[in-house]
Amino acid sequence: HYPLRRQRQMCIRDRLGVNVAFIMRCRVEGLRDIGMCQNPFGSFNFLLGLETLSLRMERHCGNTMALARYLQSHPMVSWVNYPGLSDHPFHRKANEYFRKDCYGAVLTFGVKGGLGPGTKFIDSLRLASQLANVGDAKTLVIHPASTTHEQLTEAEQKASGVSQDMIRVSVGIEHIDDIVADFAQGLEEARNA
């Protein structure tokens, strides 16, 4: 089943076959999403981003591992979920699939005290931005229980893997000392919530 299945009451898949329908869909949706051709400046930015991707990923991953280790030792943090940590349940699998010391740039952790301290932590950050995105050059954080999953009951949140204390972090390429300092002052504010 394709979302763009009908064109003038004709079922493309039934008339032309699954392969042709898929090819047409790829072409039409691709043109719709990015246009006939990319503009020169967009092409330049894409190429520049692609050329520096490996360097940025090394920094992302190094920062994430350092932040995960810092959070593990912090008294206001109840748990840290990052496959690069040796106590992660899938650490062995992560070693099979990822390059050594490059386990991605997203981690989650729990702030002791639940919802109140979690929201206080997010609101207290100065360097990191509160956004639901991932993969940016800057550090992004979100408290899903009070934002993206707020409309769900606590039981529904728990069923979807979101706890009241959970913070999701997409770690950026800023200097790690700046990231850690921001999280340290945020966790100190959360302690006083």
Q: Where do the language-model regions lie?
A:
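Single conserved hydrophobic/aromatic residue that forms the stacking wall/gate
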Residues: H1-R8, I12
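Glycine-centered tight turns that cap/initiate beta-strands
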Residues: M76-W79, L127, D165
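General beta-strand structural signal in soluble alpha/beta enzymes
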Residues: V80-Y82, A132-G135
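Short beta-strand-to-loop capping motifs
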Residues: F109-G113, F121, V171-I173
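PLP-dependent enzyme catalytic core of the Aspartate aminotransferase-like
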Residues: D123-S124, T139-A193
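A generic structural signal for well-ordered coil/turn residues at beta-strand boundaries
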Residues: Y103-A105, G135-A137, S163-D165
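Structural motif of enzymes handling amino- and sulfur-group chemistry
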Residues: R13-L107, G113-G118
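Active-site "cap" helix and flanking loop/linker of ATP-utilizing ligase/carboxylase catalytic domains
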Residues: G118-R126
